[in-house]
Amino acid sequence: MKMMDANEIISFIQNSEKKTPVKVYIKGDLKEVTFPETVQAFVNKKSGVLFGEWSEIKTILDENNKHIVDYVVENDRRNSAIPMLDLKGIKARIEPGAIIRDHVEIGDNAVIMMNATINIGAVIGEGTMIDMNAVLGGRATVGKNCHVGAGAVLAGVIEPPSAKPVIVEDDVVIGANVVVLEGVTVGKGAVVAAGAVVTEDVPPYTVVAGTPARVIKEIDEKTKAKTEIKQELRQLNPEK
């Protein structure tokens, strides 16, 4: 999986068309209303639903107010530069409420739990679980078979573009409410205890804890047993 360059992301945001998509429930004498091709109109003679850009739909509503009895607008963003990731082709388990922006890479059999937030350019390896309310900032990279605990934050780096992003190597367990700051690498097989604030690189196969996080021991059999990654949680239905 390839990490996006910060300048690529900046250019994408700069040059993207800023959009305010809306969903509008509409009621009235709709046979008298003409809808342009740029607006998706699922309507009958009396009612329906419109999908499109607010500026276009507002014009329709204003110009046809004598035919429209009532309408309700659903709107969740304004001048948004980055669309949400199209999830339909992703071979992972993604639960309701996860917010995943476009240009995120998600490996096979990964798990994204409710209300996780994953920003543009982030990379999630195969078999990795991102738990509830975790945040992966721009370009944060997590390897294979990891667990990022509930409420954890992996800081993002888009600006300044020269800054190094967070990198979490394979087989890492990050506890709940951990904060990993920009530029930190968490080495393969490491464990970060719940609530730690990680400001420096974590050596492979060590346990770190505290604020700021410090090495408290090397990984032993007891730690492995307590932080075991269960593949059963990552299984998907066979493809049909």
Swiss-Prot record:
GO terms for molecular function: tetrahydrodipicolinate N-acetyltransferase activity. It catalyses: (S)-2,3,4,5-tetrahydrodipicolinate + acetyl-CoA + H2O = L-2-acetamido-6-oxoheptanedioate + CoA. Pathway: Amino-acid biosynthesis; L-lysine biosynthesis via DAP pathway; LL-2,6-diaminopimelate from (S)-tetrahydrodipicolinate (acetylase route): step 1/3. Pfam families: DapH_N (PF08503), Hexapep (PF00132), Hexapep_2 (PF14602). Keywords: Acyltransferase, Amino-acid biosynthesis, Diaminopimelate biosynthesis, Lysine biosynthesis, Repeat, Transferase. Its EC number is 2.3.1.89. GO terms for biological process: diaminopimelate biosynthetic process; lysine biosynthetic process via diaminopimelate. Belongs to the transferase hexapeptide repeat family. DapH subfamily. HAMAP family: DapH. NCBIfam families: DapD_Ac (TIGR03532). Catalyzes the transfer of an acetyl group from acetyl-CoA to tetrahydrodipicolinate. This is 2,3,4,5-tetrahydropyridine-2,6-dicarboxylate N-acetyltransferase. The gene is dapH.
